[in-house]
Amino acid sequence: MDTIRAIIFDLDGVICFTDNYHYQAWKELADAEGIYFDEKINGRLRGVSRMESLDIILERASRCYTQEEKEQLATRKNESYVRLLEKMSPRDLSDEVKNTLDTLRQRGYKLAIGSSSKNTKKILKQIGLDGYFDAVSDGTNITKSKPDPEVFIKAAEMVEEKPENCLVVEDALAGIDAAYAGGFISACLLYTSDAADD
């Protein structure tokens, strides 16, 4: 087995939980548009881009939306989401996660973020991890979302490691598929709904 030298973490659902903020922002948008949206539908949005998420929500719409309208809807959702992120603080970073990160760093691993979110840097700042990671690859520097491996490949390049020397830690199937497609070692965190709420 190849030596693991770097660990690439997804952000949402691994380092911290922002699912509820996403849900609130999507729900607000769907309600305003008269589109049915619930937590089950929200579950389908895990690990996919904002525009792909919007397409899933619009499957239940009573009318078709132009590309321009879709972009406006996605912007509205993100504005709501960013507003909700203001509520985040270092308290949203669990002691277990922070201790794990510190231990991995002390053991000499390079640490990176590989997230499709375009709000990654804001979230890291809100939870007190701004500047903590050796590299941050996110939705602002990729053109393809998971399950394409681009976000992880860029993170590996940023820490100057080959994919086979990087462990990807994910919580979504799209992320695990992306890690596999890129030739990375992967670990999937699974949570029950009760565990995610704790």
PLM feature spans:
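Active-site neighborhood of HAD-like aspartate-dependent phosphohydrolases
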Residues: 1-43
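Conserved SAM-binding loop
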Residues: 15, 113, 168
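Helix-loop "lid/cap" segments that line or gate small-molecule binding pockets
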Residues: 29, 51-65, 123, 155-156
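Anion (oxyanion) recognition and catalysis
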Residues: 31, 105, 180
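Metal-dependent phosphoesterase signature
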Residues: 36, 59-95
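Short, acidic loop-to-helix structural element flanking the phosphoryl-transfer center
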Residues: 83-113
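Substrate-recognition "cap/lid" segment bordering the active-site pocket of phosphatases
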Residues: 90-91, 118-167, 173-184
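Conserved small/polar residues in nucleotide/adenosyl-binding loops
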Residues: 191-198
